[in-house]
Regions:
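Active-site-adjacent loops and short helices of periplasmic peptidoglycan-processing enzymes
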Residues: 15-20, 102
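Active-site-surrounding "flap" and adjacent substrate/cofactor-binding loops of secreted or lumenal enzymes
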Residues: 11, 19-24
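Non-catalytic, structured segments within soluble enzyme domains
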Residues: 26-177
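Single conserved hydrophobic/aromatic residue that forms the stacking wall/gate
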Residues: 1-5, 9-10
Length: 177
């Protein structure tokens, strides 16, 4: 399956930014994170309970990897991921932060969303804390550099994209309306 335009950029930046990392935070793979999203009603705050949940997530992750491709797992993960500010899933995140559909995201916009997946609170581009907003910009630039190293964008394109500020069209989604 070959995607074109920004859909390809999203897929490629996510693959580079997430799949090629050994974990997605807390020592878990993307498959394990998806298992936790899909099948854990409430993540235990108690360490002992959490230790009991982890093996179940591992078993589910192995089953996910048996039945789905990496791309399908990644799609499910992005469709369930909480990008903060009522933006659950890549479609809502694209709309919330940039006012567009995922297929219309620019490379630097997709890179910012991918960067948030590592730790949305630390890389929240609309945080009141200016340091956290700086973190979001820095993380976006790391994802762009990873895309350049993987050959998805040129060095010159990476440099020009990294020079851009975070241009948001932020609109908080109210699901109660």
């Amino acid at each position: 399956l070959r995607l074109v335009g920004s859909e390809m950029c999203i897929r490629d930046s996510v693959k580079r930014g997430l799949l090629l990392q050994k974990s997605a935070g807390g020592g878990s793979t993307i498959s394990q994170q998806l298992a936790k999203q899909l099948f854990t009603e409430k993540v235990a705050s108690n360490t002992m309970q959490r230790l009991l949940q982890k093996p179940i997530e591992w078993v589910i992750a192995v089953k996910l990897e048996r039945y789905y491709t990496k791309e399908e797992i990644l799609t499910m993960y992005l469709n369930k991921f909480d990008f903060l500010n009522n933006a659950v899933g890549i479609k809502t995140a694209a709309s919330t932060y940039f006012g567009c559909e995922p297929k219309d995201l620019k490379i630097e916009q997709a890179a910012m969303l991918v960067g948030m997946c590592q730790n949305p609170s630390r890389y929240n581009p609309v945080s009141r804390n200016p340091k956290i907003r700086e973190n979001a910009l820095g993380r976006r630039n790391v994802v762009l550099r990873q895309m350049e190293k993987a050959g998805y964008i040129s060095d010159a394109e990476c440099d020009s994209l990294q020079a851009l500020p975070l241009k948001l069209a932020y609109t908080r989604v109210d699901h109660k309306a």
